[in-house]
């Protein structure tokens, strides 16, 4: 095994801008062995590049032409705005993923976000198999606070996972 680049692959049909934010889990392999890549879409700053998710099927070396999930026009249950940036994500198993998304309708200046003050970041639960997104009922936050929010999300997820085990031990 080496770190040598063997080849470069492209997916142009969806308009998804390849590249990932440097925090959180930006690629993962699900239980089926398929690899998913979170794409930031130029951090939401250039509408030419969409944010979304691409997949490489197990045993393949190209992006799956049957799966590209553009999130810019995705309906988000519990949220009227649309996203321009899939910021961070964490795969939880069985097609469920928890993530943060930037929603421009919360920007004070509609043409330029202020990531120090705009509370435009929402937390979501995503189903990568059924392509659904649901807003979690947590407060919006600033993008620069997202690392703290991601830690909060993971602790909540851990509590959800451990709760059934705790209840099973109760008399």
Task: Describe each model-derived feature in a short phrase.
Residues 47, 109, 166:
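Short glycine-/acidic-enriched loop or helix-start segments at secondary-structure transitions
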Residues 159-171:
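Blade-level signature of beta-propeller repeat domains, shared across WD40, Kelch, NHL, RCC1
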Residues 1-3, 49-61, 113-129, 169-170:
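Beta-propeller blade signature
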Residues 1-96, 102-104:
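Acidic, serine/threonine- and glycine-rich low-complexity intrinsically disordered segments
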Residues 80-161:
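Loop/turn-rich, solvent-exposed surfaces of beta-rich toroidal or solenoidal domains
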Residues 62-65, 132-136, 167-169:
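Short, well-ordered strand-loop elements centered on a beta-strand within folded domains, enriched
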């Amino acid at each position: 095994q080496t770190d040598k680049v063997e080849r470069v692959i492209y997916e142009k049909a969806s308009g998804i801008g390849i590249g990932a934010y440097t925090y959180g889990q930006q690629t993962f392999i699900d239980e089926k062995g398929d690899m998913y890549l979170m794409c930031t879409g130029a951090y939401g700053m250039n509408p030419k590049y969409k944010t979304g998710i691409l997949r490489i099927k197990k045993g393949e070396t190209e992006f799956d032409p049957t799966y590209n999930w553009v999130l810019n026009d995705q309906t988000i249950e519990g949220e009227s705005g649309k996203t321009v940036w899939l910021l961070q994500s964490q795969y939880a198993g069985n097609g469920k993923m928890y993530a943060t998304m930037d929603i421009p309708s919360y920007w004070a200046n509609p043409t330029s976000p202020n990531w120090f003050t705009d509370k435009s970041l929402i937390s979501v639960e995503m189903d990568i198999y059924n392509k659904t997104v649901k807003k979690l009922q947590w407060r919006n936050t600033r993008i620069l606070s997202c690392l703290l929010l991601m830690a909060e999300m993971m602790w909540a997820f851990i509590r959800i996972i451990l709760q059934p085990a705790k209840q099973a031990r109760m008399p």
